[in-house]
Design a protein with these regions (language model features):
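Compositionally biased terminal segments of proteins
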Residues: 1-164
Length: 164
C-alpha cells in the first residue's frame, strides 16, 4: 500500500464522502492488509451507506475531483488509485451493526472505519469467488497470529512458581 501525501486523491475522496455525509467502511483485501494480512490488491473497497440507486452521488464526487468512471461502482482517482464502492457486501450484518463493530482508523489523513479481519473473512467466505476463497487460508492464519499476539501470557501454576 503506497503512502500518499496528505492531500492525496484518496484522502480528498474520503473527505468529500464525509462532507456529503456518506458513511463508509473500508472492507475487503485492503482492510485485511491494514490489519497485517500479507495480501495484494489493486483497489480500495468501501462499503458505502447509500442506497444503490443513489450511486450517482459518488460518481459526481469522482468526476469533480478529476477521476475516471471505470464502471458503475469502480472508479480511478486522478493518480490512478482504484476505488470500488460496494452497496451490499456478502456475508455481513447491516451497515449500522458492522459500522459499530469496525474500529476507527485513519487513511490518508481522513477518519475511516476498518472492517475487522474476522468480518472480512466472513464476507469473503460468503462471496465464494475463487479469488476470495484462495485468500482465506492467509486471512485465517493472520487472524490466528493476531489473536495469539493479543492474548495475555499464560499464568504460571503455583507448583511452577515454587520451583524457582
Amino acid at each position: 500500500m503506497p503512502h500518499q501525501p496528505p492531500n492525496s486523491p484518496l484522502g480528498a475522496f474520503l473527505e468529500a464522502l464525509g462532507e456529503a455525509q456518506i458513511k463508509c467502511i473500508l472492507i475487503g483485501s485492503m482492510a485485511a492488509i491494514r490489519q497485517g494480512a500479507p495480501l495484494m490488491t489493486v483497489d480500495y473497497g468501501f462499503w458505502v451507506r447509500l442506497p444503490e440507486r443513489q450511486y450517482v452521488k459518488i460518481l459526481a464526487i469522482v468526476q469533480k475531483q478529476g477521476g475516471t468512471i471505470l464502471a458503475r461502482t469502480l472508479y480511478e482517482l486522478r493518480d490512478g488509485t482504484q476505488v470500488n464502492a460496494i452497496f451490499q457486501p456478502d456475508g455481513l450484518d447491516s451497515f449500522e451493526i458492522e459500522f459499530r463493530r469496525s474500529p476507527a482508523g485513519e487513511l490518508e489523513g481522513q477518519p475511516v472505519r476498518i472492517l475487522p479481519l474476522k468480518r472480512v473473512i466472513a464476507s469473503k467466505r460468503a462471496a465464494g469467488r475463487d479469488k476470495d476463497l484462495a485468500a482465506l487460508p492467509v486471512l485465517e492464519r493472520t487472524l490466528r497470529l493476531a489473536q495469539r499476539l493479543k492474548a495475555p501470557p499464560p499464568r504460571r501454576r503455583k507448583k511452577e512458581r515454587r520451583l524457582k
